[in-house]
């Protein structure tokens, strides 16, 4: 109920809706802090911004299926957001798995999305390239393949206008836009068409090996 109240409030107050999510797949690190958490908190304090921040715990299942790790990582990530100054009274802060409508929308979007669109996703293609020609899909789960689709549901569920992303996520935003445009063509102007925002100075944060 609170999410739809905020949706209409944002619409009538002519605010820009900005959505940011972080996958709780381990302990928070400097990349999370500098690339997503601090910029999102700063932006949420602006008067013309309706900020949506969430823990993408379903996405974390792609890399591991340990419920204890997912739970503890979610708590640690939430604590990191709050300790860095997130004001939950001015921001919609939620856990992905608490919003069942996201998975419902994920299914609906999957029914209008062609497989070829997801075949071109960089994460999937990179995983295939690492395998042999005889077994191109070895150890690749459907979660990885459908990752851009669930990300689309995350974004379109709340009609985000702006989605801050790293350079590696720009293609996923383009996929989201394609899906939203196709849905709107068939069913009317249901979804906003989101735009990616990339900070050129934070596109890549090099690790201690100088690579990643």
Task: Annotate each language-model stretch with its function.
Residues 1-25, 44-48, 79, 87-93, ...:
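Non-catalytic terminal extensions that flank enzyme cores
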Residues 7-12, 61, 158, 172, ...:
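A generic signature of intrinsically disordered, low-complexity regions enriched in glycine/proline
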Residues 14-153:
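N-terminal Rossmann-like or analogous alpha/beta NTP/dinucleotide-binding catalytic cores
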Residues 125-212:
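Active-site cores that bind ATP or allylic diphosphates and position pyrophosphate for catalysis
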């Amino acid at each position: 109920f609170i999410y739809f109240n905020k949706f209409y409030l944002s619409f009538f107050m002519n605010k820009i809706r900005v959505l940011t999510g972080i996958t709780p797949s381990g302990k928070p690190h400097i990349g999370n802090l500098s690339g997503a958490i601090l910029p999102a908190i700063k932006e949420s304090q602006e008067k013309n911004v309706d900020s949506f921040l969430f823990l993408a715990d379903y996405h974390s299942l792609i890399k591991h299926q340990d419920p204890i790790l997912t739970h503890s990582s979610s708590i640690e990530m939430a604590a990191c957001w709050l300790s860095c100054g997130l004001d939950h009274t001015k921001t919609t802060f939620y856990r992905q798995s608490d919003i069942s409508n996201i998975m419902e929308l994920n299914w609906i979007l999957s029914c209008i999305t062609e497989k070829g669109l997801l075949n071109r996703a960089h994460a999937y293609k990179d995983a295939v390239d690492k395998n042999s020609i005889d077994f191109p899909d070895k150890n690749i789960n459907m979660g990885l393949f459908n990752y851009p689709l669930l990300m689309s549901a995350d974004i379109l569920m709340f009609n985000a206008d702006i989605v801050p992303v790293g350079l590696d996520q720009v293609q996923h935003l383009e996929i989201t836009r394609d899906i939203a445009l196709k849905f709107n063509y068939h069913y009317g102007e249901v979804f906003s068409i989101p735009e990616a925002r990339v900070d050129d100075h934070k596109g890549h944060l090099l690790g201690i090996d100088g690579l990643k």
